[in-house]
Regions:
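A short, N-terminal "cap"/entry segment at the start of jelly-roll beta-barrel domains
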Residues: 1-35
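Structural motif
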Residues: 66-68, 75, 91, 101
Length: 112
């Protein structure tokens, strides 16, 4: 059993852009095949370059604001309440071209 209180978690930079901050609730190794379970804040103008994961699915649940995801070359504007699943090997990027913060909870699942 594990309980994590948000206010006790240190903010760290995400792996694709250290300026974008996240709080990791569950890190790799605690649950089999779970890469992480985290909360991220994208400030206006922040972005992550196009990348892909060879052996991981990612799921994002938008909690506030709006963001732009480009997945396989297609642009999607997402907002509060939307859920996005990105499969392994799908090139994707995220950005916040809007005027308010975008926040989301996300996790990665390793495929074996």
């Amino acid at each position: 059993m594990k309980i994590v209180h948000t206010n006790t978690i240190e903010e760290v930079g995400i792996s694709h852009n250290e300026d974008i901050k996240k709080k990791v609730f569950i890190d790799k190794g605690y649950i089999p095949q779970l890469m992480n379970f985290s909360f991220a804040t994208f400030k206006p103008g922040q972005f992550v370059e196009t990348h892909l994961h060879k052996t991981m699915y990612e799921v994002f649940y938008i909690q506030s604001g709006k963001a732009e995801f480009i997945i396989n070359g297609e642009k999607y504007i997402v907002q509060k309440g939307d859920c996005i699943t990105i499969e392994a090997m799908e090139p994707h990027s995220q950005s916040n071209p809007f005027k308010e913060n975008a926040t989301w909870i996300y996790f990665g699942i390793i495929i074996v």
